[in-house]
C-alpha cells in the first residue's frame, strides 16, 4: 500500500569515552529508523570515500513492531576505527542510507512529502581527546591568524616610529653642525 511508504530517519552516535580509553578503539553507530518498505542499502563514508573495513551492519532490517504486517523497519550498522583516527578533528564520518521508495510516476495523494527514492544521511566529525572539534580548530586557527596580523602590524608601526626618530636625530645633528 503506497500510503504506508516512509523514508528513514538516520542518526549517527559517537563512540563512548569508556570504549576509547579501555580498548583504544572507537565505534560509531548508525541507526536508520521508521522506514517502509525495507528496501534500503546502508554504507559508511570516511572523508568522502566509501569504506568497508571495520563495518558491521545488521544482516537485514528488523520490524519496529513485529506484530504488525505493515510495520516500519529499522537497521543498525557499526563502524570501528582506531581511537587516534577518531580523535583527529579533520576526519569526517558519514552514514548513508539509500532508500528505494516511490518513483516519480507513482500517484501520491497524502498530505506529506512524497517518499521517493532518495539518499538520507547523518554525519559526525572526529573529536580530539582534548575536546577539539573541527569548528573549534578552525576558530583557533582564525584567532591565531588575527593575533599574528596584529603583532605584525605593531612591529611594522614600531619600525616606522624608530626609523622616523633616527631620521629626525640625523637631521637635527646635521642642522646643528651646519
From Swiss-Prot:
Name of protein: T cell receptor beta constant 2
Localization in the cell: Cell membrane
The Ig-like C1-type domain, residue ranges: 8-117
Disulphides: 30-95
Any one cellular-component term (Gene Ontology): alpha-beta T cell receptor complex
Family annotation (Pfam families): C1-set (PF07654)
PROSITE patterns in the cross-refs: IG_LIKE
Keyword Disulfide bond in record: yes
The record's note on its domains: The connecting peptide (CP) domain is essential for signal transmission in response to antigenic stimulation, likely downstream from ZAP70 recruitment.
Gene that this polypeptide is encoded by: TRBC2
Cytoplasmic topological domain residue ranges: 168-178
Assembly: Alpha-beta TR is a heterodimer composed of an alpha and beta chain; disulfide-linked. The alpha-beta TR is associated with the transmembrane signaling CD3 coreceptor proteins to form the TR-CD3 (TcR or TCR). The assembly of alpha-beta TR heterodimers with CD3 occurs in the endoplasmic reticulum where a single alpha-beta TR heterodimer associates with one CD3D-CD3E heterodimer, one CD3G-CD3E heterodimer and one CD247 homodimer forming a stable octameric structure. CD3D-CD3E and CD3G-CD3E heterodimers preferentially associate with TR alpha and TR beta chains, respectively.
